[in-house]
């Protein structure tokens, strides 16, 4: 995420110095080209929850999603460093198709839950079989943070990106309790 924000900041700064000749769409295209993927540069530039996918014509499709105002995100940032390359090393080269299907289904529940504020859909949608089983062991105390957040009222808790930050989703009224857990 930090490289993406640096790229976006550099592009916005350069564009401003040149009296903003490039529209946001072109800045987005440049940011994706520089970073190599849209995962972090898109929300860094557009803000909010963004979905990205490469289409059959090899162009990036970007969709900004609604996020119900009753749902808040709380992020715990541990005082450890974890490089993306280190986090990628623990990932298997292949995963069972059933795990991939499970994650795709969970994503549909999560997105609908975030849009509608449906707590049960968010809880069910925060289930992951592709990344977290391998990456939690890299974040010392991470599972304790997850348990504390859930016990404090979080609807779900996950590793943010490659880690080590941990994201909890909660109802607005539980945000303070979750953040103090």
Where are these regions (language model features)?
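A short glycine/serine-rich beta->alpha loop
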Residues: 1, 29-38, 93-98
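Short glycine/threonine-rich catalytic loop with a Thr-x-Gly-x-Asp
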Residues: 1-5, 97-101, 156-161
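DPxDG-like acidic metal-binding loop motif
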Residues: 2-23, 45-47
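Alpha/beta catalytic cores of group-transfer enzymes, especially the acyltransferase/condensing modules
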Residues: 21-71, 143, 157-159, 163-167
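Short beta-strand-to-loop capping motifs
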Residues: 54, 78, 168-172
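Active-site rim beta-loop-alpha module in soluble metabolic enzymes
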Residues: 74-137
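Glycine-rich, charge-dense phosphate/pyrophosphate-binding loop(s)
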Residues: 114-181
